């Protein structure tokens, strides 16, 4: 016996032609039953607590310690703030879905979540590029580092990254609102992403496809190319150093950033490739999306906390004082 499709209330626009759902239904991870989802909620809550504690700690340490008011740490504070917001946008809703089976998400809230996820991801990409530029100047032009990356310049870079991310992705919710949707409104995902909402439409989505591809190439694509080019120049400069110890010390300052870049871009590239292959949303697609959104907020504080001596020592000092 075929399982009946779950129908969702439809809202029509004033012209009576375009329709959209009152809410969408989130599936979570396709193929997994309620019991598995329930048990997955506990590691998810642990990840959220770890991401919140880790990123908040980094932001507060950099805010309090005036000696850390340098470009590298200011960019790190921006990265931690973005990760903190991104994890708060995705993880609590996922936890309610996994723990209590609350699948419903209102149409406009879904669009807002989608917009913030994509826009803040673009901002994070720009901050990672800025951090690569900081490492390039520090290693290749150390005498000019203080004059090139002043506090004012860092603030302008941060504001530009935020503006670019929000401006590029601002049209997406409106483009999705113009589409008509089918009678079934089940999103085979744990949260709302542009490509998954777009697949539910009964109308032509070529504008969405073209604009989405344009954003990926012009934002994340360009950023990743410049990051790669920066590291080619950094590697070239490091290899030209006469002392092996100096070369290792110089490159060691880049390891944390390289880890952050890999954790962000590898799942993003995988997600883009899987999506471009077309077809229904697969388990691999969902896993890649979850990795892309959930892993960086958890991993970045751990990597920077372990590899950055100033932050690590401050955290150890806080714990030692708290234990007295």
Swiss-Prot record:
- Keyword Glycoprotein annotated: no
Q: Name one GO molecular function term.
A: G protein-coupled receptor activity
Q: Please indicate which superkingdom the organism of origin belongs to.
A: Eukaryota
Q: Name one GO cellular component term.
A: plasma membrane
Topology term for the membrane: Multi-pass membrane protein
Topology, Extracellular side: 1-38, 89-112, 174-209, 272-285
S-S bridge residues: 110-202
Q: Which UniProt keywords apply?
A: Cell membrane, Disulfide bond, G-protein coupled receptor, Membrane, Olfaction, Receptor, Sensory transduction, Transducer, Transmembrane, Transmembrane helix
Q: Where are the transmembrane segments?
A: 39-59, 68-88, 113-133, 153-173, 210-230, 251-271, 286-306
Which regions of this chain are Cytoplasmic-facing, per the record's topological domains?
A: 60-67, 134-152, 231-250, 307-324
Location(s), subcellular: Cell membrane
Q: Which family does it belong to?
A: Belongs to the G-protein coupled receptor 1 family.
Function comment: Odorant receptor.
Q: What protein name applies here?
A: Olfactory receptor 51D1
The organism named in the record is: Homo sapiens (Human)
Name the gene for this chain.
OR51D1
């Amino acid at each position: 016996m075929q399982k009946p499709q779950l129908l969702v209330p439809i809202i029509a626009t004033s012209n009576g032609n375009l329709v959209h759902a009152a809410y969408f239904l989130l599936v979570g991870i396709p193929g997994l039953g309620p019991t598995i989802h329930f048990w997955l909620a506990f590691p998810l809550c642990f990840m959220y607590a770890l991401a919140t504690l880790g990123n908040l700690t980094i932001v507060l340490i950099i805010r309090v310690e005036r000696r850390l008011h340098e470009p590298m740490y200011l960019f790190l504070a921006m990265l931690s703030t973005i990760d903190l917001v991104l994890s708060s946008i995705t993880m609590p809703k996922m936890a309610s879905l996994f723990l209590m089976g609350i699948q419903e998400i209102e149409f406009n809230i879904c669009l807002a979540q989608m917009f913030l996820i994509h826009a803040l991801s673009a901002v994070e990409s720009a901050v990672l590029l800025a951090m690569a530029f900081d490492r390039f100047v520090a290693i290749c032009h150390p005498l000019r580092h203080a004059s090139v990356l002043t506090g004012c310049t860092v603030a302008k870079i941060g504001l530009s990254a935020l503006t670019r991310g929000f401006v590029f992705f601002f049209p997406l919710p409106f483009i999705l609102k113009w589409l008509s949707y089918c009678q079934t409104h089940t999103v085979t995902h744990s949260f709302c992403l542009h490509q998954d909402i777009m697949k539910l439409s009964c109308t032509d989505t070529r504008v969405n496809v073209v604009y989405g591809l344009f954003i990926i190439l012009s934002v994340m694509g360009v950023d990743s190319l410049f990051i790669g080019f920066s590291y080619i120049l950094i590697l070239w400069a490091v290899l030209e150093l006469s002392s092996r110890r100096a070369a290792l010390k110089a490159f060691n300052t880049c390891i944390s950033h390289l880890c952050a870049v890999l954790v962000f871009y590898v799942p993003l590239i995988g997600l883009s490739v899987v999506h471009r292959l077309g077809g229904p949303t697969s388990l691999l697609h969902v896993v890649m999306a979850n990795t892309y959104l959930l892993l960086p907020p958890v991993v970045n504080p751990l990597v920077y906390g372990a590899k950055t001596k100033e932050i690590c020592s401050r955290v150890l000092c806080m714990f030692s004082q708290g234990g007295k």
